[in-house]
């Protein structure tokens, strides 16, 4: 029960952070999406240990686990544009497949690098 409550709180904090960054981006008329700026800021805060990973880890893990659910509204919205899909469907599909492949390869490579680095760090600290 405590873990569930902590997860919900962390998701709420991530949501508030995202809304705040989107608001700031809109208020300052920045042409970069708030989500991109938010990721960079969150990464920077985590890197410099201003925010501890434990403060957002459970919520972020749940959001990543349920990521597919967040794409359903977008997929349903595509149905409304059947004429565009019939005209450019193959091109759109090609872009989606290639970009998905690039993201998967990049994510897998980065995850392996991080895991190796973490393992190396744990090995060095256990030897000391």
Curated annotation (Swiss-Prot):
Concerning Pfam families, the annotation shows: LrgA (PF03788)
Q: Which keywords are on file for this protein?
A: Cell membrane, Cytolysis, Membrane, Transmembrane, Transmembrane helix
Q: Does the keyword DNA-binding apply?
A: no
Transmembrane as UniProt keyword: yes
Please list every transmembrane segment annotated in the UniProt record, as residue ranges: 4-24, 27-46, 59-79, 88-108
* Membrane-protein topology: Multi-pass membrane protein
**Location(s), subcellular:** Cell membrane
Stated role: Increases the activity of extracellular murein hydrolases possibly by mediating their export via hole formation. Inhibited by the antiholin-like proteins LrgAB. In an unstressed cell, the LrgAB products probably inhibit the function of the CidA protein. When a cell is stressed by the addition of antibiotics or by other factors in the environment, CidA possibly oligomerizes within the bacterial cell membrane, creating lesions that disrupt the proton motive force, which in turn results in loss of cell viability.
> Of which family is this protein a member?
Belongs to the CidA/LrgA family. CidA subfamily.
Q: What is the protein name stated in its UniProt record?
A: Holin-like protein CidA
Annotated organism of origin:
Bacillus velezensis (strain DSM 23117 / BGSC 10A6 / LMG 26770 / FZB42)
Q: Which gene encodes it?
A: cidA
